[in-house]
């Protein structure tokens, strides 16, 4: 097989024994290579990362209920995340196994990221792609830094769990398609269960499940593909109905969907531009983003022009792969249009929205590499393989550098959290079941990388610190403010509207260690008027 063998050609029956043995050895080498890269890329981080955002909330809520057993702990978490029951069970299981030590949680998160890469590799191989090409695509997915929060943040790893379940279901469905009889039905029933579990972990996989019929048809064209896809659709409709009835996610009104579609598309284009030219940021238009966009336009445009002139038959498979990657990426982004506030270009914990699209983006980028290598090789009269390897290596280095930079930011956030909690531990505890307003607490260590940025992470950490499962704590940052109302301390913010009772609330300036019990409206005003720390 040459370098140019791709997934565009349908698998032609069972390979010869020698070829099969060679493929097995190559598959084993690719798997070993991906495992090694995962250990090098994520192993050190698992030892010094921390809890972030929802991690604190889940840890505190599970701990208080789990004294009555694991099931009680699961039930308590379901009260705050009932629309994603499999993801919630996963969070409870991690809490039961690893407790308050982030290391075990982060090892599982990294393992799920590796699992996505390995399962994608397996799917591409089943669909006929040679290891030489499926391997680099899986490697790009493993390192893809614009969705790295799902590998660096324990709660975010539920998104990778969802993708693992989806890809496992897809593999099972593809293996079942050529078969007939009870075994085939049982295998597809298993795939439907995996799809359902995936959707009950995270919603990103809904559209991919509905589009899986395209792969079914490619694997085994005909009525069996349609019948089995029909079973998928019915199951997804039932699960989606349950999730929609229980969700607390803010949805955009229909009138806002066109504007949201433009916003999501612009963010996605910025992510794709960065993926091709991994320099700079994705948050705004910059020279780097323009260069990335021009690379896409020039390479695709030149390839399409050659094909149109009938001189680029070798380019067609890669154009098809680029189109398939675009479809996969779009399938990952469609669900964002109706969800308020999510943008693919955002950083930190918000980049989890790119997690499924990353599979398609990696396919698209690798197709672009091959299109560029083929055209450059012909123009320069040089072998294609070294050019393709060099271009892929440049991308891998760019991804790895950004990943290491992001990991440094997440480590900084963990260090800042430790400092904040040490400072809080040195102040008197709020009255039992009372409230805490913490001033001069850093919200983020880097864009989107939280220290304590919401009530749920501050509350979870404070409850664990003082062993008080009724305490409410608010960091006065990230647009949040306090006011001295008649009945108590009013806390307002984008996610908050609460009132903390006088006499059972403390104000703490984390930077100075100043701490005061707020017993009255006058005491509240005195604190704010004398010195209102800002963060």
Question: What residue ranges belong to the model's regions?
Answer:
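Perimembrane helix-loop-helix junctions
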Residues: 207-237
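Transmembrane-helix signature of polytopic, membrane-embedded enzymes
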Residues: 120, 124-146, 163-164
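Juxtamembrane segments of multi-pass membrane glycosylation machinery
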Residues: 89-111, 116, 121, 279-284
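Membrane-lumen/periplasm interface segments of multi-pass, membrane-embedded glycan/lipid transferases
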Residues: 61-96, 233-310, 336-344, 348-351, ...
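Short hydrophobic alpha-helices at membrane interfaces in multi-pass membrane enzymes
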Residues: 172-196
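Transmembrane-helix motifs of polytopic, lipid-linked glycan transferases
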Residues: 107-128, 168-172, 301-302
